[in-house]
């Protein structure tokens, strides 16, 4: 994820007299030299975007070095990965001793260790590109390093899903706070509309839970399941439309919400019902409407970005064909 972050640091200054001749220029140069292109505080810093606050340059009095220091608060454009993030393109650079080592082609520099099962070890070849899901609490940003490290596995679609029990209405103010995430989804959907439809169909079919044919890949905003196959008695709700109605107090968020596997994960759809009749053994998660919608919207963003990235990475038939062994592995290991 790309974001803005604010950092507070103490900067050591070797030559205070020279530094103070042009504090702004020297400070920005020092920050760029020390932090840009490196890991710091659970992020990879892309660029310094501004100095928010700084102290005067103090002289160290604990020794006779003549060095100085300054307290600085600055903002930076950063990239960071979270547990369970999906990365569409990880290039295999090593595959032996039951360990697959890969480098992400799409995110900040990160080396990913994939503890392989025997089948994965036999299938994934050095130089191939595989879709990966990061493991829980597996991303490490060691300060000063030029790349992060993580563990993950070749991403296989799963049947599991969560049910959320909302007992309080979403307020207009909370709905307004969610519009930033809604805008991200709409931008991703617009980007998707410009991609090769055959490639979209291929990857949606690959990562859909149930058997379908490519001509059944419909508009994600109205998707209701494979043709001629009733996978749910409920009519899915378009989360984006629901939130626009919530801004006008025209919708109720009470009840049980879920995104079971009969929906495309990259669709902006979810089910809402008064009583929990979802087919899962997991207990419902009781949470506020705002927390539930943030969770659903971020999941939609994650999958939409993943699908768009797959289409951008494997953007021709030859490249898709060269990775048939990977697609076969994914099909065979679907739960």
Curated annotation (Swiss-Prot):
What biological process terms from GO does the record include? viral transcription
What's written under domain?
A: Contains an extended C-terminus, with no homology to characterized proteins.
Q: What does this protein do?
A: Component of the DNA-directed RNA polymerase (RNAP) that catalyzes the transcription in the cytoplasm of viral DNA into RNA using the four ribonucleoside triphosphates as substrates.
Where would you say this protein principally sits, based on its record? host cell
Q: Which domain of life is it from?
A: Viruses
Keyword Transcription attributed? yes
Cellular localization per UniProt: Host cytoplasm; Virion
Induction section of the entry: Expressed in the early phase of the viral replicative cycle.
Q: What is this protein called?
A: DNA-directed RNA polymerase RPB7 homolog
Which UniProt keywords are present, listed alphabetically? DNA-directed RNA polymerase, Host cytoplasm, Transcription, Viral transcription, Virion
UniProt subunit comment: Part of the viral DNA-directed RNA polymerase that consists of 8 polII-like subunits (RPB1, RPB2, RPB3, RPB5, RPB6, RPB7, RPB9, RPB10), a capping enzyme and a termination factor.
Q: Has the keyword Nucleotide-binding been applied to this entry?
A: no
- Gene Ontology, cellular component aspect: DNA-directed RNA polymerase complex; host cell cytoplasm; virion component
Q: What protein family is recorded?
A: Belongs to the Asfivirus DNA-directed RNA polymerase RPB7 homolog family.
